[in-house]
Amino acid sequence: MTGSRFASGGLIDRKKPITFQYDGMRVQGFAGDTIASALMASGHQIVGRSFKYHRPRGINSAGPEESGALFTVGDNANRTPNVKGTIAEIHDGLIVRSQNAFPNVRYDVGAVNGLIAPFLTAGFYYKTFVGPFSGTRFWMMFEYFIRKAAGLGVASRDADPATYDIAHHHCDILVVGAGPSGLWTAVQLAEAGQSVMLVEQDFACGGQLLSRNNARDAAFIAEMQSRLTRAGGRIMVRTTAFGLYDGLVTGLVERVTDHLSAPHESLPREIFHIVRPQQIVLASGALERGLAFGNNDRPGVMLAHAVARYAGRFGVSAGQSCIMATSHDGTYDDALQLAEAGMQICVLDARPCHTDAQEAAKRVGLDILFETVPVQVAGGRGVAGLEVGMCDSDGVVHSDNRMIGADVVGMSGGYSPVVNLLSHRGVKPVWDADIQAFRTGPTTEAIQVVGSADGFYDNEACLASADVAVSHILRPRRRDAETDI
């Protein structure tokens, strides 16, 4: 995989170039880039190493679910380890370092661990260096080196020079997530006279709409934000809802200055917000699931929607030729978007040809292999090709050693609604066979779940679920108003 920047497109501001350091090298991006998108556009393929065997790691996702692109950001007392490059914004003067590698991620001597993997089984150090010797001297001799090898980034030992703040809020409605369903819900409730707080962990509102980068979606996002602001609602970006407690008390963390080159000295780095709403709407979206196949951790193997998101939002091509392995219709929109952007696309669909999305993709000339699944990625430091096999009606894979050339593999096993916040309240997820995922279970508290967080992945269905939630929230208030009259 060799990433590059498309000549046009994306939501970045190409009139505002930004230069930052990555492992001592100068890298250029643009305003609106994340660390991950800027590195991908600059052709950086290996950005990390695995914890134990130091296998090469690339960028896997485009959001907070990222597990491979973890960096140490800042210097000296301002050094922060294990920062997810997929959500961290770049700014002039930013210092970024790779982690868990020596001398660097491209040539890491720790990769020798892979050669002796049979001897490094889970918990090997407890068996190898403990007993049958008397006492613990043998273990104590090796413990230092084992502990030193553990972990990824290294935290600073200097005192943190930044300041932090805490704030308390009361509101009628707290909406978590500013995708299409979250925006639509917040606008309707605010225009109905409710005091609304809308929080979004990203630095821009829009959710999945940001990936498509078309005029209609951009107009919808702008209109929703404008209407919400005019109605008195509050929008908080770069803000993560991390905890849901008794009485609907919600904990938020707002990142205030990490994206600024020279923040004013009076600004705190982060603010811990404690919100006490009357009702909560969870529009936290869904996360794409990967697929299990050989070497699916190689640089260049990504979540399918992430490949499209880098193209649509950041104007970055993850490679020249992409294989999209999927088991559902949603991936076809991503494949068509990438094909229109100029990438060579081949879709592997584990299912037979039965759906409208499949037929539509065939009509526009997309290369599709039905009842075909990935078996193993070829290539040591990236994707050189993909071995594929046939999947029969019983789900058994039959490999025929067929190899397809590509430098990017996008994989998608469907989506899983983000149910963690409601789980904090003891609500158990419920399996839904129709969407092959866990959905939020029923709750007696004043909490509504909308959009992809409730298992609706079509944009119209997401907005319809928001309408239902708004009606449910406003119904008691309308009844009270009629009683007062």
Where are these regions (language model features)?
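Residues forming the flavin
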Residues: 1-25, 29-485
